[in-house]
Amino acid sequence: MTYDRQVIAYKNYFLDFYENLPVNVQAKIEWTLNLIRVTRQVPEKYFKHLEGTKGLYEIRVEVGNNIYRIFSFFDKGNLVVLGNAFQKKTQKTPKNEIDKALKIMEEYFNEKNSK
């Protein structure tokens, strides 16, 4: 199987969230991440640019009535970097989660550019 994209987790932001999820939710997240790896044009239902941001995307996962969001961004075109994640409980994505994701993205690029 060839991959169009590589997906990595930056620090432990995503992993700390992921490790505490039920196995069935982890499996759906893995399925969705694999879809992002192998599909050139991922349907917006699973992977969508977050309006009003520069370069921030949300990976969308639904399991039953539960909705999960994983913030991500691109580096070097085909590298998807996972940031923070949360379980969505309201219609609108909480501003504090978006702000946190933007700070993580800034931290990633500042750290990368200082090397």
Q: Model-flagged regions — what are they?
A:
Residues G83:
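ATP-dependent carboxylate-activation loops
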Residues M1-I67, K76-V80, K89-K115:
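Basic, Lys/Arg-enriched alpha-helical interface segments
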